[in-house]
């Protein structure tokens, strides 16, 4: 009986060791996969932004813009957060601003480095007329993703609503450098005209 007990104990230890080894391999491979996924995500964005700047016409630019938005809305490592963002966006589009705000805030809590979560919350705050809070979230969005033309045009819209036309113009000028065919930059001449009139 003593001999059998030792054998059972030995087999148990082997099983535990195999389980620990499996767990270590699993988590290490997950980390590698996540890192690879994020690397792929960043590389695709880099390519799309080059294509966006070099687009020859509006139709070509719109296709690239959609690709960029698809990547922005996709968390590079966590599908669950992607699903949450989709839910919050749907609620926001349906006018459920308070619920959307809570969801976006929860995503930010879980991953404060995801620029699109900040941008979505900035958007819902804009819709709620909470301009100061929206501007704070836009600032954070641009710290994480300086090329975020959606955040720049959104900030320009807030400044237009606040009649701070020079700030609006500055943001749209930055947008044009990143995305020359952006529909938002079409109002640059109007803003310049308003500012010229104010100077007279």
Write out the residue ranges for each language-model feature:
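Canonical tetratricopeptide repeat
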Residues: 86, 120, 154, 187-188
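Alpha-helical adaptor scaffolds
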Residues: 77-144
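Residue-level recognition of tetratricopeptide repeat
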Residues: 114, 148, 165, 181-182
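N-terminal leader/linker segments that initiate helical-solenoid repeat arrays
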Residues: 32-82
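TPR alpha-solenoid repeat register
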Residues: 117, 151, 184-185
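Conserved small-residue packing positions in alpha-helical repeats and bundles
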Residues: 48-52, 88, 122, 156
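Terminal, low-structured helical/coil segments at or just beyond the last alpha-helical repeat
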Residues: 74, 169-200
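Register position in tetratricopeptide repeats
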Residues: 93, 127, 161-162, 194-197
């Amino acid at each position: 009986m003593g001999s059998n007990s030792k054998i059972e104990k030995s087999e148990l230890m082997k099983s535990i060791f195999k389980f620990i080894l499996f767990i270590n391999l699993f988590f290490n491979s997950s980390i590698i996969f996540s890192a690879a996924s994020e690397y792929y995500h960043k590389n695709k964005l880099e390519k799309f932004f080059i294509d966006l700047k070099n687009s020859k016409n509006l139709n070509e630019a719109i296709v690239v813009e959609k690709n960029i938005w698809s990547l922005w809305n996709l968390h590079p490592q966590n599908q669950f957060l992607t699903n949450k963002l989709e839910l919050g966006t749907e609620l926001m589009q349906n006018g459920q601003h308070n619920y959307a705000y809570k969801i976006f805030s929860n995503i930010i809590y879980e991953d404060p480095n995801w620029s699109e979560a900040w941008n979505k919350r900035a958007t819902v705050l804009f819709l709620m007329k909470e301009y100061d809070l929206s501007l704070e979230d836009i600032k954070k969005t641009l710290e994480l993703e300086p090329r975020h033309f959606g955040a720049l045009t959104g900030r320009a819209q807030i400044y237009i609503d606040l009649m701070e036309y020079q700030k609006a113009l500055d943001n749209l000028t930055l947008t044009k450098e990143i995305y020359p065919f952006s529909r938002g930059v079409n109002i640059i001449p109007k803003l310049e005209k308003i500012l010229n009139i104010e100077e007279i």
